[in-house]
Amino acid sequence: QSSAGGWFATIPADAITPPGAAYYIVGTTADGEVAHFASAAAPQPIRIEPTLVDRLEQLDDARLDGRRESVSLDLDGHDFGNRYGNLDAFLRAELRWTHRVSRTLHSVGFGFGSIWGRTPDSDGAFAEEQVALGRYGIAEVRVRAHPSVFIDGRLALGVSDEGFLRGGGGAITLGKPWRSNVSMGADMLDDLGPTAFVRLQWDTAWPVLMGASIVRTDLPDAQVSANGLYIKYDLGYRVNPTLSVRGAVSYGSRDGAGRFGGGVGVQTDF
């Protein structure tokens, strides 16, 4: 009995399991038990519903069988070609580690990236090719603003062939990143130039994920034109519960006829 009047009971938290608990109140008299509220045959239920964030975390854990870490390696590049036959191409590699929190803060991560490229230093048949190089570290964060809205942010610091390199970027995904969605985003790496994309992903042939993108980029520090544009088609496949692979092909140009590019990637979850 409470000192403030009335009666109360405390149930240990570890004794409660979803969807909740049930109780009844009886008293003991000389004639036996007297039911005051509900009964053993018909107890009063108390439902304990998890919050939306808790439910989403449980769904993530069930989908990934409790695996919260991932390591991925991606390699992408494109040859833009040039109407004068000069080389205009880039190759970009990134190694990333991600820890999934699976709450409103969905994941955090860090990684390392490298960019190599050659591009004409001017417009014309006698332009010389300049080399563009960059090495940088990445810090990433993903926020689940809604069950089907994810917002990504990243910062990059490193060095390029011209000195200190800073960068940043962001993206928004409408839908589930691991199923059908539409995403758009951009990033910038100081003197190496900006990149922006719009991508549609669909899962009609699960477990194969397919995607189509439009990408505009100045990589690798293009001097001829800022209109490097290509389309990209990619396929992702989950080989087993812990291993996924990706392949992509791209086609587009900057100054002249279109050329091909592509990419590969691998990710392991643990």
Each predicted region: which residue ranges?
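Outer membrane beta-barrel transmembrane domains
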Residues: 123-128, 197-248
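Outer-membrane beta-barrel "beta-signal"
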Residues: 258-270
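Residue-level signature of outer-membrane beta-barrel architecture
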Residues: 99-101, 141-145, 172-176, 200-204, ...
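Repeated loop/turn-to-beta-strand initiation elements of outer-membrane beta-barrel proteins
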Residues: 103-108, 146-153, 177-184, 205-212, ...
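Glycine- and aromatic-enriched membrane insertion/assembly motifs of diderm outer-membrane
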Residues: 87-157, 169
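Transmembrane beta-barrel strands of outer-membrane/channel proteins
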Residues: 71-77, 108-116, 153-159, 170, ...
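Solvent-exposed loop/turn segments connecting transmembrane beta-strands
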Residues: 81-90, 102, 116-118, 131-133, ...
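Glycan-association/targeting regions that enable binding to alpha-glucans and other polysaccharides
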Residues: 1-89, 110-112
